[in-house]
Design a protein with these regions (language model features):
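Flexible, active-site-adjacent loop/turn segments at secondary-structure boundaries
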Residues: 2, 49, 53, 112, ...
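Glycine-rich phosphate-binding loops that contact phosphosugars or nucleotide phosphates
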Residues: 12-154, 173
Length: 224
């Protein structure tokens, strides 16, 4: 990916927001997991047309839109600029890249030609690099990436096999003609559960629902 650097970002922000929708927001969700261990300032993912009223000049808003034409993200960008936030973007181009260039702001241009949900790494890794650049994340995270890539490659090989040993076949058989409900705790695996729910809905064209613990213990559990 290419980083077109405009005006200098501040070295330290008081809060960070990722504005995005669907597959373009999941990268921010993954980064938010790091907040518990590696990020010592507030980090939020906003899915919608605006950002919170407390956003100001000390807030960094990262606008993530694979196509660059997501209307909610473009509106959130405009709202962020009005509120004086520092803004940047991760996109393949479109109106988002054009607006950021006009504003002389940073934009990471990532490869096009994919479905947004298949471009997770292209939205996630640039955010990591950006936060390292401005001193929010330690560079030690770079040492994790090769292990993650190797693990994903090994899993892909296993899950691509046409055999009974492939655990994905068993899972697919269990949820066929059903409505899956995915429960997770609200720590690190919550993002994985949300991602799985989205993948089932978009790739399999079927309904799927997700909730997390311990919140569901106070309401949804009664429905069972």
């Amino acid at each position: 990916a290419n980083c077109l650097v405009g005006s200098e970002m501040c070295i330290r922000d008081s809060s960070i927001i990722v504005a995005g929708m669907g597959g373009s927001a999941i990268g921010g969700d993954i980064v938010s997991v790091l907040e518990k261990e590696c990020i010592d300032i507030p980090f939020f993912v906003c899915r919608g047309y605006s950002v919170p009223n407390w956003v100001n000049k000390n807030t960094l808003v990262i606008c993530s839109s694979y196509s660059g034409n997501t209307e909610e993200t473009l509106a959130a960008l405009d709202d962020s600029i009005i509120k004086g936030a520092q803004v940047c973007g991760v996109t393949t181009g479109g109106s988002l890249a054009k607006k950021l260039k006009i504003e002389n702001k940073d934009v990471v241009i990532i490869p096009s030609g994919l479905q947004p949900r298949a471009a997770l790494a292209y939205s996630f890794v640039p955010m990591i690099k950006l936060l390292q650049k401005i001193g929010i994340l330690d560079t030690k995270i770079d040492s994790w990436l090769p292990d993650v890539i190797e693990s994903l490659l090994n899993d892909r090989e296993l899950h691509s096999q046409d055999s009974k040993e492939n655990p994905i076949f068993g899972l697919a058989d269990k949820i066929y003609n059903r409505i899956p409900i995915i429960y997770s705790d609200n720590s690190t695996v919550n993002v994985a559960a949300l991602r799985l729910k989205g993948q089932i809905c978009e790739n399999s064209k079927m309904l799927c629902y997700h909730n997390d613990l311990p919140e569901l213990n106070h309401n949804e559990i009664v429905g069972w």
